[in-house]
């Protein structure tokens, strides 16, 4: 599907976005191995999160409901059953990486696969710690999906992440739930901590301090009533749209503002963005609030180190924004983007050039000069949801009608993206 986007006169209105993708995955998985029912409201509508539901159902978990409301009938740590066939993770790296930690502890063998894009994404980062815990995992070419996971009794380990990754951290912690003793994960740079918050919410004994997370194995997890905050990564596209287009004033309600994710807002405010958060509330251990944003002239800057890790999913749309700043934007330490749904460094640069923007690709990032004009163009999502949405935002500031090729890629995380954009773009 191709989508035509006209320049916007302004981005205005008040919107509520679908549930956070990262939190939805975690709630579905933990609810399945908790005892009793968990009611999940505002579950993500994205295809990735429904891949997780499909996998849990295949493992014998009854999940009722539809749309954004589900009840997961948990069976406890030892309640999963061997699936009748292979598990399908679709396009979801979160599903295959995090769920593998649970599968590694099961008394049966599981084969889990994904689509063509996921089949190109390396899995050594989860295979190594799980092997140390006692699991046997076979992979295509020793690193790519499908994975064949021979589960069994696991041992607790003390593991240091070689690079920051919330998915790998979660995989090890999920495996640690089934091991006797304490499993410790040390991360070089703080990554999003939704897993730690959710595990505590379900009753796990877990401590986190100075980059070290320690989990006591074999806890009794208890089902909960849960509300998923709106996804800040989805909000990022509309925040950037409002910042880019003159005369814009936008309100986004009920957004998850976990400090490990809100670095995006701190970055933008530091660049001069007119962003307000009138009040914060706590919901299932997660902070939520309303974001108010207006068109702003931004200075630009450098994204590197821990900041890069904190905004890794938002870098495609931040790259678009960088071209409109006064000083431009330099992004470093983002090599992880090379192994996302696409090589996001290459696909961002390719589409920026179509936009008429000068951009330089580096081994682990991008250099984007500022004060550049956007022209109408035909953009290609290359099947990557974040690329599709980032360049739809770019098109709002173009000098004519643009086309997003393969626009349906957005449905992986945000099926309502196009209708929401039409509602707020004047």
Swiss-Prot record:
Q: Which GO terms describe its biological process?
A: amino acid biosynthetic process; aromatic amino acid family biosynthetic process; chorismate biosynthetic process
Binding locations of 3-phosphoshikimate:
21-22, 26, 165, 167, 313, 340
Alphabetically, the GO molecular function entries are: 3-phosphoshikimate 1-carboxyvinyltransferase activity
Q: What is its EC number?
A: 2.5.1.19
Where is this chain primarily localised? cytoplasm
Residues that bind phosphoenolpyruvate: 21, 93, 121, 167, 344, 386
**Record bears the keyword Nucleotide-binding:** no
Keywords assigned by UniProt, alphabetized: Amino-acid biosynthesis, Aromatic amino acid biosynthesis, Cytoplasm, Transferase
Recorded metabolic or biological pathway in which this protein acts: Metabolic intermediate biosynthesis; chorismate biosynthesis; chorismate from D-erythrose 4-phosphate and phosphoenolpyruvate: step 6/7
Q: Which residues form a coiled coil?
A: none
* The organism's place on the tree of life at top rank: Bacteria
Enzymatic class: transferase
Q: Where in the cell is it found?
A: Cytoplasm
| Quaternary data | Monomer.
Instruction: State its role.
Output: Catalyzes the transfer of the enolpyruvyl moiety of phosphoenolpyruvate (PEP) to the 5-hydroxyl of shikimate-3-phosphate (S3P) to produce enolpyruvyl shikimate-3-phosphate and inorganic phosphate.
Designated name of the protein: 3-phosphoshikimate 1-carboxyvinyltransferase
- Source species, please? Solibacter usitatus (strain Ellin6076)
**Organismal lineage:** Bacteria, Pseudomonadati, Acidobacteriota, Terriglobia, Bryobacterales
């Amino acid at each position: 599907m191709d989508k035509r986007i006209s320049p916007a006169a302004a981005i205005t209105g008040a919107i509520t976005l679908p549930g956070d993708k990262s939190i939805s995955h975690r709630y579905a998985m933990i609810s399945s191995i908790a005892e009793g029912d968990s009611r999940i409201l505002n579950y993500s509508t994205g295809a990735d999160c429904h891949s997780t539901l499909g996998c849990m159902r295949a493992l014998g978990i009854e999940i009722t409901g539809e749309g954004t409301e589900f009840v997961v009938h948990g069976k406890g740590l030892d309640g999963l059953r061997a699936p009748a066939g292979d598990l399908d993770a679709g396009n979801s790296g979160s599903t295959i990486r995090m769920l593998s930690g649970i599968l590694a502890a099961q008394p049966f063998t599981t084969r889990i696969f994904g689509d063509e894009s996921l089949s190109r994404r390396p899995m050594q980062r989860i295979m190594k710690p799980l092997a140390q815990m006692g699991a046997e995992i076979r992979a295509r070419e020793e690193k790519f999906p499908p994975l064949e996971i021979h589960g069994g009794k696991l041992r607790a380990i003390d593991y240091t992440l070689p690079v920051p990754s919330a998915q790998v951290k979660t995989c090890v912690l999920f495996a640690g739930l089934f091991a006797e003793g304490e499993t410790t994960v040390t991360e070089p740079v703080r990554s999003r901590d939704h897993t730690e918050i959710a595990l505590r919410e379900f009753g796990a004994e877990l401590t986190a301090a100075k980059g070290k997370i320690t989990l006591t194995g074999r806890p009794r997890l208890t089902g909960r009533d849960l509300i998923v905050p709106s996804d800040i990564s989805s909000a990022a596209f509309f925040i950037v749209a409002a910042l880019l287009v003159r005369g814009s004033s936008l309100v986004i309600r009920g957004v998850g503002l976990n400090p490990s994710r809100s670095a995006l807002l701190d970055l933008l405010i530091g660049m001069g963005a007119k962003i307000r958060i009138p009040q914060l509330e706590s919901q299932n251990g997660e902070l939520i609030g309303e974001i108010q944003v207006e068109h702003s002239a931004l200075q630009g800057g450098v994204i590197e180190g821990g900041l890069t890790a904190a905004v890794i999913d938002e870098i495609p749309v931040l790259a678009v924004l960088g071209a409109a700043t006064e000083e431009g934007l330099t992004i470093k330490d983002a090599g992880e983007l090379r192994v996302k749904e696409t090589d996001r460094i290459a696909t961002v640069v390719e589409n920026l050039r179509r936009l008429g923007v000068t951009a330089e690709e580096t081994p682990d990032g991008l250099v984007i000069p500022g004060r550049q004009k956007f022209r109408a163009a035909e953009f290609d999502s290359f099947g990557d949801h974040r690329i599709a949405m980032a360049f739809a935002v770019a098109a709002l500031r173009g000098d004519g009608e643009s086309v997003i090729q393969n626009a349906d890629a957005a449905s992986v995380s945000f099926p309502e993206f196009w209708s929401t954009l039409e509602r707020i773009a004047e």
